[in-house]
């Protein structure tokens, strides 16, 4: 795992956006794995700026999102489809039919999960997967205890995750209790992974991810099993890392 520590959230967002732009410039048919939540918002903002400034063409690219809430339609304002359209898809020329988000309000979740896995396979797999990290170490909605061989499935959200996401809803009672999420094995199947973490609240999760042995109790630690992971954190998110980990840090700007 390559660790890159940057000054702040703004620099983190720029570096992550630059990585995605580089992928698309090198391979116009790049398959992007995308994340939602608070952390990637700045990255998407920077990605739009870079794409417009450099006339980046996404017409041959495609994307797969990590997850979607169970029970929300794609047009619900808090659905992850709506999030992606607002924060990215409506601002670049990626074809709508090539942007994939799990369907959360289907009547057959098993079939939807199988369909999603097959769609990823038919696309040739994900070239670069963007991740955030939860305070409890979750990636996607793979909560602690998620097995390393898990595929896309319906997951039960923990109370801490529901409470963390309540800020996007009018009340905690409105937050869905389940989600369709790519599994750990699905995520590890990406050719490259870039994980972003910002703020002191993520510092302990970052420490556990990087310093503990891979364990299902800290889903993000299972990324140690992947051959090409870049972890970009700001100084606050890196504040609990030990000297031995920091000794191997890739300097910002290199």
Swiss-Prot record:
It comes from the Bacteria. It is an enzyme of class 3 (hydrolase). It catalyses: alpha-D-glucosamine 6-phosphate + H2O = beta-D-fructose 6-phosphate + NH4(+). Keywords: Carbohydrate metabolism, Hydrolase. The keyword Hydrolase applies. GO terms for cellular component: cytoplasm. InterPro entries: Glc/Gal-6P_isomerase (IPR006148), Glucosamine6P_isomerase (IPR004547), Glucosamine6P_isomerase_CS (IPR018321), NagB/RpiA_transferase-like (IPR037171). The active site is at 67 (proton acceptor), 136 (for ring-opening step), 138 (proton acceptor), 143 (for ring-opening step). GO terms for biological process: carbohydrate metabolic process; glucosamine catabolic process; N-acetylglucosamine catabolic process; N-acetylneuraminate catabolic process. The keyword Hydrolase applies. Pathway: Amino-sugar metabolism; N-acetylneuraminate degradation; D-fructose 6-phosphate from N-acetylneuraminate: step 5/5. One of its GO terms (molecular function) is identical protein binding. Pfam families: Glucosamine_iso. Its EC number is 3.5.99.6. HAMAP family: GlcN6P_deamin. Catalyzes the reversible isomerization-deamination of glucosamine 6-phosphate (GlcN6P) to form fructose 6-phosphate (Fru6P) and ammonium ion. Belongs to the glucosamine/galactosamine-6-phosphate isomerase family. NagB subfamily. This is Glucosamine-6-phosphate deaminase. It comes from Brevibacillus brevis (strain 47 / JCM 6285 / NBRC 100599). The lineage of its organism: Bacteria, Bacillati, Bacillota, Bacilli, Bacillales. The gene is nagB.
């Amino acid at each position: 795992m390559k660790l890159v520590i940057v000054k702040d959230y703004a620099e983190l967002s720029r570096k992550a956006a630059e990585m995605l732009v580089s992928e698309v410039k090198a391979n116009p048919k790049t398959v992007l794995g995308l994340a939602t939540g608070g952390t990637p918002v700045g990255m998407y903002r920077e990605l739009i700026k870079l794409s417009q400034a450099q006339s980046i063409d996404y017409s041959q690219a495609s994307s797969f999102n990590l997850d979607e809430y169970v029970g929300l339609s794609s047009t619900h304002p808090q659905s992850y489809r709506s999030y992606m359209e607002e924060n990215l898809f409506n601002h670049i020329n990626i074809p709508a039919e090539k942007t994939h988000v799990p369907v959360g309000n289907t009547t057959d979740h098993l079939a939807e999960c199988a369909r999603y896995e097959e769609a990823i396979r038919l696309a040739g797999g994900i070239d670069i997967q963007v991740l955030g990290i939860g305070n409890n170490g979750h990636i996607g909605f793979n909560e602690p205890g998620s097995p390393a061989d898990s595929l896309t499935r319906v997951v039960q959200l923990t109370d801490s995750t529901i409470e963390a996401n309540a800020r996007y809803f009018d009340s905690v009672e409105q937050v869905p209790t389940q989600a369709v999420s790519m599994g750990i094995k699905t995520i590890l199947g990406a050719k490259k992974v870039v994980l972003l973490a910002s703020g002191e609240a993520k510092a302990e999760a970052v420490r556990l991810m990087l310093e503990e042995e891979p364990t299902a109790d800290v889903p993000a630690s299972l990324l140690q099993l992947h051959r090409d992971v870049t972890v970009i954190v700001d100084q606050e998110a890196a504040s609990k890392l030990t000297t031995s980990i920091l000794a191997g840090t890739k300097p910002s700007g290199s």
